[in-house]
Amino acid sequence: MASKTKASEALKVVARCRPLSRKEEAAGHEQILTMDVKLGQVTLRNPRAAPGELPKTFTFDAVYDASSKQADLYDETVRPLIDSVLQGFNGTVFAYGQTGTGKTYTMQGTWVEPELRGVIPNAFEHIFTHISRSQNQQYLVRASYLEIYQEEIRDLLSKEPGKRLELKENPETGVYIKDLSSFVTKNVKEIEHVMNLGNQARAVGSTHMNEVSSRSHAIFVITVECSERGSDGQDHIRVGKLNLVDLAGSERQNKAGPNTPGGPATQSTAGGGGGGGGTSGSGSSGERPKEASKINLSLSALGNVIAALAGNRSTHIPYRDSKLTRLLQDSLGGNAKTIMVATLGPASHSYDESLSTLRFANRAKNIKNKPRVNEDPKDTLLREFQEEIARLKAQLEKKGMLGKRPRRKSSRRKKAVSAPAGYPEGAVIEAWVAEEEDDNNNNHRPPQPTLEAALEKNMENYLQEQKERLEEEKAAIQDDRSLVSEEKQKLLEEKEKMLEDLKREQQATELLAAKYKAMESKLLIGGRNIMDHTNEQQKMLELKRQEIAEQKRREREMQQEMLLRDEETMELRGTYSSLQQEVEVKTKKLKKLYAKLQAVKAEIQDQHEEYIRVRQDLEEAQNEQTRELKLKYLIIENFIPPEEKNKIMNRLFLDCEEEQWKFQPLVPAGVNNSQMKKRPTSAVGYKRPISQYARVAMAMGSHPRYRAENIMFLELDVSPPAIFEMEFSHDQEQDPRVLHMERLMRLDSFLERPSTSKVRKSRSWCQSPQRPPPPSTVHASMASAPLHPATVVDHD
């Protein structure tokens, strides 16, 4: 990748203060912040300070008080950065501060009112206005929108916004997000629509400090690719990337305040309200502490990175401590131009948070970036589009559907043409209509046909010619009397088939032309929709505006330098007209030095207290992690077998890209195991698991204690029962004793089981016996039905 290296430049830091809210005024809070716009200084007064304690003063690149407008911040600070992005640099703008100090207002503002629009909508307008005024350049603008919620990266433009994305790193391109969606936009309306879709899926919630507070860090990424023909006749591509960051608000849980209802962060269309860094007593509860802990960790990691970069003594920069710092790696000390907007609250109850934000921003001033132009990268989408357009154009020229247009002087205007058949519904293709100018007189000739009109005309003419030719051939076949009817029919069918093939080819050509125009419409070409002299006037106005902003910046720097020079002059001046004058001058100097000494002592004391507070927070976090670790070890030692624990430990590996421990898959990635293996049986040959001791006991004997099945062994009687018939005469009366003897004899013969006995199904012994019949019917039943030995009843 070729690049134009530029000398290192410092990260630009500006401070902005909002006015007191009605709620703060009603509560009686006083204003403790003083902004000096000309000198770029912020003075913070401690409301709990002892008498005689001096306020703290911080100096920044620019300062905007409560009366400042959105346009002032954008024109003086952000506009030069957007111009650099259009030239091929990487740029980042992010707002940092306490929750409710106006970070989202600074970044987004109110979209419906032009005067209240923030950095993001003004950047949209700036980018596409610049493209429309450019000459002989092709642009491709892409947009992506993501958020970091509880250290998980989510794509806000995806159909599944809750899906977790992976963070990867390429040695050539740097850090990137795998499977992050990107949309090509052609105007301000489309890119605003993309952002509104993402805002609907962003996580926001309510806290004591802000009713609509951002619960995630949101990053809107705009990639601008520009192609321009150089002096060598080759097309050179520049790629600029703009990161617009809206940080979430961290929480200080130990600060008093009414609790708000808990619950998970909601999905709202507000796009975040509070957003931002610093510590905040927001009175959050429920799921908010969990969100706040993740936000605090990421912002603490951001502070550690800035401290390491500003100190110039650390060889290791902890970019990998959080997802936020890894994504902003180029923006902090890398290949980017970065602007940090520190938003402040003027109320007395926010003294600690404002002081923390000011110290954070003051450290960030010392960070040095090394921005360079990203020229001719390998993975540009614009180059792919140009190659695809050239291929489609060659196919159309081969089919004769695309003719060469003569070169002419033209004043161009833009026209919207509805999409042809085969193009997605509702799409609009931008066609450029050129009108020739007559050099002799100022009259315009009729407008020349557009590319789409020329294509449609060529297609219609070609189809009409082929149809006429086929009709003539069909008529000639009909008139030819030398042909047999079967041959005529066959030839006519061939002609009809040729006509159908012609129509299908025509449809394929139309689809190809539609694809060509769709690809070409995504490339924005400047200088075609506004008069050239108007473009020049607008460019002059922008240059004047930039000169005024640059003059203000130089004036501010000169005033700061004059103050330093005055102090040095007073120290160097050693001649006095009298002893009284010398005493007065040295007394004044002594008071000033004593005030500086007291300020340094107070700063040291504040730093010591902050160090103790940070150390206590770290100790508390360490103790909490130690308790969780002990609990997990206790569960593992008591509930997980050692062999299973060893299996789990053997599968663990460290993912260096994400800094996380992960499990190796059970089946290797290269093995194609289409059939799933069967689960191993616990006891082969048995229905239930049986111990080894029970198996040995079963082999030694048939003790039922060790058997899982077939506990009892019973011999099966397979001989069928014998059934015999008894016949009695109803009129003959017999002696009961004779009947009894006959029954006994028949019973003996039954026990002998003769082979001639009839086999019938009998009732089992376990069935309940039926009620015996009356005595008068016994003989009749015995005479009419066979008698079973078990059913013989003596009624004597």
Curated annotation (Swiss-Prot):
- Cytoplasm among the record's keywords? yes
Domain of life assignment: Eukaryota
Family annotation (CDD domains): KISc_KIF3
Stretches assigned to the Kinesin motor domain: 10-367
Chain sites annotated for binding ATP: 97-104
What compartments host this protein?
Cytoplasm, Cytoskeleton
Range of residues in the leader sequence:
none
Q: Name one Pfam family in it.
A: Kinesin
**Coiled-coil zones:** 378-632
Provide the transmembrane region boundaries: none
Q: Which UniProt keywords apply?
A: ATP-binding, Coiled coil, Cytoplasm, Cytoskeleton, Microtubule, Motor protein, Nucleotide-binding
Segments for region (Disordered): 251-292, 397-421, 754-796
Gly residues biased stretches: 270-284
Q: Does the keyword Transmembrane apply?
A: no
What the entry lists under InterPro entries is as follows: Kinesin-like_fam, Kinesin_motor_CS, Kinesin_motor_dom, Kinesin_motor_dom_sf, P-loop_NTPase
**Function, as annotated:** Microtubule-based anterograde translocator for membranous organelles.
Q: Subunit details for this protein?
A: Heterodimer of KIF3A and KIF3C.
Q: Please state what the protein is called.
A: Kinesin-like protein KIF3C
This protein's species is: Rattus norvegicus
Gene field? Kif3c
